[in-house]
Amino acid sequence: MDKQLRYAIALTGSIGSGKSTFVSLLSLYGYQSICADSIAHKVLEEHSAEVIAYFGNEILQSDNTINRKVLGNIIFASSSKREELQAILHPHIQKAILTQAQQLEEKKVWYFIDIPLFFEVGGKEAYPVARSLVIYTPKAKAIERIMKRNNFTFEEAKARIDAQMPIENKCRLADDIINNEGDLRTLQHNAETYIQSLPCVDCVQSS
C-alpha cells in the first residue's frame, strides 16, 4: 500500500475559523472531503466504555450515552485530561481517516481531509498529505462565531480556542493559507482562487 497521500490536502485552522463552511464550498466544485470530527464522533461511541472508565459517570446523560458538552468542558479545562482522551481516541481516528484516504487516492484527483488538530497530532508525520491548508480567522472573531453558533459563553468559547495551537503558529507551519476574516462571498472568492492555483493532476502523477 502506498502510504503517501499524493492527492490529499489537510484542511485545518482553529475552531470557529470557518473550515466547515469552506468544505461546503468545496463540495459545490465537486471536491470530496473526509471529516475528522464526524469520524471522532463515531469513534467516541465505539470506545465509550474506555472513556467512561477514565472520566467517570459524571459525563453520562440519563440514557447512559456520553454528554459531549460536559466532556468538552472537562477536557478543555484540563490539558492532562484532554491528552488522555486524545490518547484513547486518536489512534482509531487516524486509522479510519487513512483508510478512507487510501480509497480516495485511487481516484487520482485532489481531495481534502478536514482535521482541526492536524498540527497538534503530528502534521505530515501522522498524515502524509501532499499539502496543508489553514483557514485563518483572528482569535476574537473566531470566539464571536463560536459563541453565536454553539450558544457558548465567552469563557467556554475562549477555552476551546486556547486548547488548540495558536492560529498564527498554524499559519507558519502551513503550505497554504486562506483568509476568512470577511463574509461568505469573500471566502467563496478565496476558495475559487485557491482551487485554480492547485497543480494539475497530471503534474502530480508524473512527479
From Swiss-Prot:
Show the Gene3D superfamilies listed in the entry.
Answer: P-loop containing nucleotide triphosphate hydrolases
Query: Do you know which Pfam families this protein is assigned to?
Result: CoaE
Subcellular localization is given as:
Cytoplasm
Q: What EC designation does it have?
A: 2.7.1.24
Q: Please report any disulfide bonds recorded for this protein chain, giving both cysteine positions.
A: none
Which pathway does the UniProt entry assign to this protein? Cofactor biosynthesis; coenzyme A biosynthesis; CoA from (R)-pantothenate: step 5/5
The UniProt keywords, alphabetically, are: ATP-binding, Coenzyme A biosynthesis, Cytoplasm, Kinase, Nucleotide-binding, Transferase
BP GO terms, sorted: coenzyme A biosynthetic process
Root EC class? transferase
Give TM segment ranges. Answer: none
CDD domains according to UniProt? DPCK (cd02022)
Query: Which InterPro entries does this chain map to?
Result: Depp_CoAkinase (IPR001977), P-loop_NTPase (IPR027417)
Q: Name one GO molecular function term.
A: dephospho-CoA kinase activity
Residues forming the DPCK domain are 8-207
Question: Which residues does the annotation say bind ATP?
Answer: G16, S17, G18, K19, S20, T21
Got a GO cellular component term for this one? cytoplasm
* Reactions this protein catalyses: 3'-dephospho-CoA + ATP = ADP + CoA + H(+)
Which purpose does this protein serve, as stated in its record?
A: Catalyzes the phosphorylation of the 3'-hydroxyl group of dephosphocoenzyme A to form coenzyme A.
Family under the similarity heading: Belongs to the CoaE family.
What's the name of the protein? Dephospho-CoA kinase
Gene name for this UniProt entry: coaE
